[in-house]
Regions:
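Class II aminoacyl-tRNA synthetase catalytic cores and aaRS-like
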Residues: 1-234
């Protein structure tokens, strides 16, 4: 009778014996159970999951419960950030946190979000980039610095642009663009190799279509002039 009150999404505590099904799934032969938490609203149907993309974006908790791919994506991001920090630390970089509220929008050509600082009675802006403060730190004496920064841009959005996103910036004294190209290549090759076990990855393009990308080094080096000539046909 008590089973009639159980629904998908309920949390229960159980006592019983562990066993493995014919398909190899570890299960529990329940002898006793108690309610821990009752779901107040029904979850998406078990087999089809959450199919409405708008609902998935606005109610991420439903997306996480319904789609293991979403959970895996969050876990992969966490692993990537951890390996990214390890890579920077291994190469002698110091991580900094620069101000999110700034008196002037700087570091990129983008429209900022504006808010008001009540204590000082002044308008401030959510940062559009951490660049200026990081460069000031280099002037102050740091040799190698980086930041994994949340930034905000009050502009349009598409599959590759959001108003709030994470930006990674680093600066190293006496490096030129060739040093940065080499460093960036080594970064992606090492981190992707650790996390994916392959240099071939699949990612969405600007249109949302999945495309295959080969990160096997060495990467092609092209100057802006070479790319302009190739794209314009001149």
């Amino acid at each position: 009778k008590a089973l009639d009150n159980l629904h998908v999404g309920d949390y229960i505590g159980v006592k019983g014996e562990l066993f493995t099904t014919q398909k190899g799934e570890i299960s529990v032969l329940v002898k006793e159970f108690t309610f821990l938490s009752k779901t107040l609203r029904p979850l998406p149907e078990k087999w089809h999951g959450l199919t409405d993309q708008e609902t998935a974006y606005r109610k991420r908790y439903l997306d996480l419960i319904s789609n293991t791919e979403t959970m895996d994506r969050f876990k992969f991001r966490s692993q990537f950030i951890r390996e990214l920090r390890n890579f920077y630390a291994k190469h002698g970089f110091v991580e900094l946190d620069t101000p999110v509220l700034q008196v002037a929008a700087s570091g990129a050509l983008a429209k900022p979000f504006k808010t008001h600082y009540n204590a000082l009675d002044m308008d401030v802006y959510l940062r559009i980039a951490p660049e200026i403060y990081l460069k000031e730190a280099i002037v102050g004496g740091f040799d190698k610095i980086f930041e994994i920064a949340r930034v905000f841009r009050n502009e349009g959005m598409d599959a590759s642009h959001l108003q709030e996103f994470t930006m990674v910036e680093h600066y190293a004294s006496y490096w030129d663009y060739k040093d940065n190209m080499k460093f960036t290549e080594e970064m992606f090759v090492e981190i992707v190799g650790k996390l994916k076990g392959s240099m071939n990855i699949t990612i969405p393009n600007r249109e949302g279509e999945l495309v295959s990308v080969d990160l096997t080094p060495p990467w092609d080096r092209k100057t802006p002039r070479e790319l302009n000539i190739a794209d314009s046909g001149l």
